[in-house]
Structures are given as structure tokens and as C-alpha cells.
């Protein structure tokens, strides 16, 4: 299969693109060596504010929507960066968009992908590390932070949680100018 991931994402998202969604990002999940494992397509309809986020994987027939089967749990996003900086503190946020914004600002950041993915993820790459949880400023964000904190504490991590309620009226990290 010679189709580039970007072209495959456009093909697989064609229906949403016809409905007015615009591409925002194609997030690549890799192993610690940088080998691609799967991608997440992110589109946004700027008229409605709705997001369209779908996983994409490469199988024997080409790129298709869906995630590979991960018996040990889904990999963390930016896993290569985590492996390259094993002694640095890590910021965990809810989505790839936020992790990329933090990385652009110079922080080491990762995510499990979404507020409901904490229990479906392989967090062992963070074992014993200093971790700062930066949840979204909503109920789902608090549930996510609580779930991730419990998992990380069991892995021997030192965990800090950003109290987003005291920040200036922001819903999510990327609303803050970084």
C-alpha cells in the first residue's frame, strides 16, 4: 500500500469533510522507536463547534478506521518522546491536541487520547515518574484525572493535579495562549 497517511485520512473522513468539517490534525501514535502504530484523525466543524475524531490503522488491505488490538492496553501518545526523556516530569492531558500544544511550548506531554480512555491504556511507560495531570475543566476532566491518578499512584508515580477551576475561564488547555 503506497497511500500516505494524510491521503488515507482525507479519504476516510470524506463524508465528514463534505458536511463542513475541516482538518485540524493527524496525530501519529508510535512505539518508543518512532515506528507508527496508529493515527487519530481530528476534524472540526467551525460553524457548529463539533469535533470529529477517529482512529485510523494500517492493516493488510490499507488504511482503515479503527485502532489495532492492544492486548496490554493502548499506547500513550508521544511515546518516543517519553522514552527519550526518562527523567523529565511528564504532563498528562486529555487529548492529543493539548499534548501537542504543550510540546510546542517545550513541555514533555502525553495523553491516553480521551477522557474515557484511562482504563484502556498501558501507563507503564510512566512508572516511577513525576507526573502532572492537567485535566479539561469539566466533569469528565475531573473523572479522568481521578482515574489516571489512581493508576499512576499504583505504578509508583509522584502525581500532581492542576486545579483548572482556579485558572482564568478556560475550558481546555489549548484555549490558553501558550
Which residues make up each language-model segment?
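A short acidic-Thr-Gly-centered motif at the start of a beta-strand
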Residues: 17-20, 74-86
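Glycine- and charge-rich intrinsically disordered segments
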Residues: 1-7, 172-177
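Conserved active-site segments centered on acidic
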Residues: 2-19
Amino acid at each position: 500500500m503506497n497511500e500516505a497517511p494524510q491521503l488515507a485520512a482525507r479519504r476516510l473522513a470524506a463524508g465528514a469533510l463534505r458536511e463542513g468539517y475541516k482538518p485540524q490534525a493527524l496525530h501519529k501514535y508510535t512505539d518508543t522507536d518512532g515506528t507508527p502504530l496508529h493515527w487519530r484523525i481530528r476534524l472540526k466543524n467551525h460553524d457548529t463547534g463539533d469535533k470529529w475524531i477517529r482512529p485510523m490503522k494500517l492493516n493488510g488491505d490499507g488504511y482503515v478506521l479503527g485502532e489495532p488490538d492492544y492486548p496490554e492496553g493502548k499506547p500513550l501518545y508521544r511515546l518516543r518522546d517519553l522514552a527519550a526523556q526518562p527523567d523529565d516530569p511528564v504532563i498528562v492531558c486529555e487529548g492529543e491536541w493539548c499534548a501537542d500544544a504543550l510540546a510546542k511550548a517545550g513541555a514533555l506531554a502525553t495523553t491516553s487520547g480521551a477522557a474515557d480512555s484511562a482504563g484502556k491504556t498501558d501507563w507503564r511507560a510512566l512508572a516511577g515518574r513525576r507526573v502532572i495531570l492537567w485535566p479539561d475543566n469539566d466533569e469528565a476532566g475531573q473523572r479522568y484525572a481521578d482515574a489516571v491518578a489512581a493508576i499512576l499512584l499504583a505504578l509508583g508515580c509522584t502525581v500532581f493535579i492542576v486545579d483548572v477551576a482556579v485558572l482564568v475561564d478556560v475550558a481546555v488547555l489549548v484555549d490558553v495562549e501558550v
